[in-house]
């Protein structure tokens, strides 16, 4: 077989082996095979290879195993080109060598080479076996996997456990649940690997119930299957389930969690603001054999930032060895969401100046958010324009979202509107919602109504747009307009996303909704709410009832505001913690202007620092003021 130009490399030649073998007495072939397997370096393999070539043993029909052993040895020492060059220099390679070469190409990302080798195998009139297909499937996309699946069936290997597992994995990675399920259901024996691949498939599609059912039915579970299930919960909006499963893993004692487990659990903590649980995981990592590598450190930075403890995030960041771009991005985003815009921009510049790392599209999202939160219009526009001009990064919808938010919050509504119209891509509902929110903030109800009614005409299903339009109508007392929007939502089956606020007390996350009376301490919570209401009124509080969407009497509007979810969470925090201790509240939606005013007053009259994370950013309330400067 001719040598491939792509794989040309410096393998030993006969004429070069004299020196290498002058003091090397050749052992018998069986011993050579053992020596190849035990080789500690590529130099040892090259020396043995040279000796074998000198004695022409590679061509000996009794010793084909030497070729295979050399191929695998080069691959195991990272000399992939040596390994594949050896294959291409072999005359009439057999099935075992073809399979070894396909496997080497596949596991090293040389997908095209793997398929070329498979075609050569078929051209040599050699029938592939189960190991050939298992190796080749590692290089398959869903599309090519379907083609290879037909070959698998042609050669009668459809129910082989190794091949079936490979097929399930290919379909799972491509999100083809139906095909994966068909192969999985036909397997006479389901392996740990195939079951884990199927769980991955369910989890990727957000079907965590099916994933958990299969997970629970497994007789044996390794750490990979645990990780897939925990991460599946965390990535699809079930953070509490993720943490409960993590605790179950620890309680069972085996298998031991690894770095991937910890990162998934930290992600779950980030979503619900479970700071104490996140801190416990940090301590657990330090006391276990889990390495505090850059991935775990980045997970900790993200968790501490999103759970309201920026100081601890900074400490972890400073102690992180060999920071990669993901770690820098996490810290920049942390500064941005807490309103420390100048620190975010400083880090953006330090990252490039000190480390030489180039920013990615994710870096620019955090940096532009920092500009938006601080109203740094000129700086934000300069950074946005530099993406393409200096770094060759094409702006995505998220970057336009930051720019539109920046312009809108600064009151440049027409400019924000023009930016959306001039984009080279279709605007999504998040982008339009940003402009609508800015219209409400700056009182431009004409433009707001125009945009909202245009979007409703496009039949956009985002409930936030309808709610913003309702807010615009309510702000000017147009309750007929509010009722019209509400009826329209009913007709289209659009349900308003409920506001949910959480607070963590003694490692337990407590959840509240507006008007919630299901908490065990509900009586004490409402008593505290009444006390708060009396005290803030004595400090000049006047309810902003324009934020109430219902056409109610003024007293009823005030009562409606008093039981918003964030106020219930704050009240529970006040009765459950020591006087003067800080409170951390997490809300899934933007905090309304009235609750923002009330929280400032509560921080003043109680002498407490209150940290609140809403959909947009963090608010640090201290002594009657907020870190956002009432700009959010």
From Swiss-Prot:
Keywords: Chloroplast, Metal-binding, mRNA processing, Plastid, Repeat, RNA-binding, Transit peptide, Zinc. Gene3D superfamilies: Tetratricopeptide repeat domain. Residues 507-537 are annotated as: Type E(+) motif. Binds 2 zinc ions per subunit. Residues 1-19 form a transit peptide. It is found in: Plastid, Chloroplast. GO terms for cellular component: chloroplast. Residues 538-632 are annotated as: Type DYW motif. Its cofactor is Zn(2+). Residues 431-506 are annotated as: Type E motif. It comes from the Eukaryota. GO terms for molecular function: RNA binding; zinc ion binding. Residues 497-512 are annotated as: Required for function in RNA editing. PPR repeats lie at residues 94-128, 129-159, 160-194, 196-221, 222-256, 258-292, 293-323, 324-354, 360-395, 396-426. InterPro entries: DYW_dom (IPR032867), E_motif (IPR046848), Pentatricopeptide_rpt (IPR002885), PPR_At4g14850-like_plant (IPR046960), TPR-like_helical_dom_sf (IPR011990). GO terms for biological process: chloroplast RNA modification; mRNA processing. NCBIfam families: PPR. Belongs to the PPR family. PCMP-H subfamily. Plays a major role in single RNA editing events in chloroplasts. Acts as a site-recognition transacting factor involved in the edition of the site 5 of ndhB1 and ndhB2 (ndhB1-5 and ndhB2-5 sites corresponding to cytidine-830), which are plastid-encoded subunits of the NADH-plastoquinone oxidoreductase. May provide the catalytic activity for editing site conversion. This is Pentatricopeptide repeat-containing protein ELI1, chloroplastic. The gene is ELI1.
């Amino acid at each position: 077989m001719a040598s491939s130009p792509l794989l040309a490399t410096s393998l030993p030649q006969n004429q070069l082996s004299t020196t290498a073998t002058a003091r090397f007495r050749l052992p018998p072939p069986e011993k050579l095979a053992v020596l190849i397997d035990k080789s500690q370096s590529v130099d040892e393999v090259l020396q043995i290879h040279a000796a074998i070539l000198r004695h022409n043993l590679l061509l000996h029909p009794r010793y084909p195993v030497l070729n295979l052993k050399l191929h695998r040895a080069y691959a195991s020492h990272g000399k992939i080109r040596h390994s594949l060059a050896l294959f291409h220099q072999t005359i009439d390679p057999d099935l075992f060598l073809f399979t070894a070469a396909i496997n080497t190409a596949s596991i090293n990302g040389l997908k095209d080479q793997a398929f070329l080798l498979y075609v050569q195998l078929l051209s040599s009139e050699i029938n592939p076996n189960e190991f050939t297909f298992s190796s080749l499937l590692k290089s398959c996309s869903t599309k090519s996997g379907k083609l290879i699946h037909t070959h698998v069936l042609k050669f009668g290997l459809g129910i082989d456990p190794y091949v079936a597992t490979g097929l399930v994995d290919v379909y799972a990675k491509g999100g083809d649940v139906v095909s994966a399920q068909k192969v999985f259901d036909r397997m006479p024996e389901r392996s740990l690997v195939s079951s884990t691949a199927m769980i991955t498939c369910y989890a990727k599609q957000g079907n965590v119930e099916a994933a958990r059912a299969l997970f629970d039915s497994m007789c044996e579970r390794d750490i990979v299957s645990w990780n897939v299930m925990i991460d599946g919960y965390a990535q699809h909006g079930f953070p509490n389930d993720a943490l409960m499963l993590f605790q179950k893993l620890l309680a069972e004692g085996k298998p031991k969690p690894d770095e991937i487990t910890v990162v998934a659990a930290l992600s779950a903590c980030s979503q619900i603001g479970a700071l104490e649980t996140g801190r416990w995981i940090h301590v657990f990592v330090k006391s276990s054999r889990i390495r505090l590598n850059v991935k775990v450190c980045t997970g900790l930075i993200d968790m501490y930032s999103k759970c309201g403890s920026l100081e601890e995030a900074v400490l972890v960041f400073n102690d992180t060895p060999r920071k990669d771009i993901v770690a820098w991005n996490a810290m920049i985003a942390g500064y941005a969401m807490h309103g420390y815009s100048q620190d975010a921009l400083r880090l953006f510049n330090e990252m490039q100046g000190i480390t030489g790392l180039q920013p990615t599209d994710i870096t620019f999202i955090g940096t532009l958010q920092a500009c938006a939160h601080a109203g740094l219009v000129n700086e934000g526009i300069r950074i946005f324009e530099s993406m393409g001009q200096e770094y060759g990064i094409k702006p995505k919808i998220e970057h336009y979202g930051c720019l539109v938010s920046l312009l809108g919050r600064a009151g440049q509504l027409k400019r924000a509107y023009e930016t959306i119209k001039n984009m080279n891509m279709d605007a999504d509902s998040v982008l339009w919602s940003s402009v609508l929110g800015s219209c409400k903030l700056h009182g431009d109800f004409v433009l707001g109504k125009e945009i909202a009614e245009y979007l409703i005409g496009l039949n956009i299903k985002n409930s936030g747009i309808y709610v913003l339009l309702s807010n615009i109508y309510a702000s000017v007392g147009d309750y007929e307009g509010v009722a019209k929007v509400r009826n329209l939502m009913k007709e289209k089956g659009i349900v308003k996303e409920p506001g949910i606020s959480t607070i963590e007390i003694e490692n337990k996350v407590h959840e509240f909704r507006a008007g919630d009376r299901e908490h065990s301490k509900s009586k004490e919570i409402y008593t505290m709410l009444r006390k708060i209401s009396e005290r803030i009124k004595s400090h000049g509080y006047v309810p902003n009832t324009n934020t109430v969407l219902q056409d109610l009497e003024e007293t009823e509007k005030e009562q409606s505001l008093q039981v918003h979810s964030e106020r219930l969470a704050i009240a529970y925090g006040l009765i459950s913690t020591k006087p003067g201790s800080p409170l951390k509240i997490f809300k899934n939606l933007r905090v309304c202007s009235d609750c923002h005013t009330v929280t400032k007053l509560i921080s003043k009259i109680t002498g407490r620092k209150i940290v609140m994370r809403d959909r947009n950013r963090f608010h640090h309330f201290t002594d009657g003021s907020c870190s956002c400067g009432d700009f959010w």
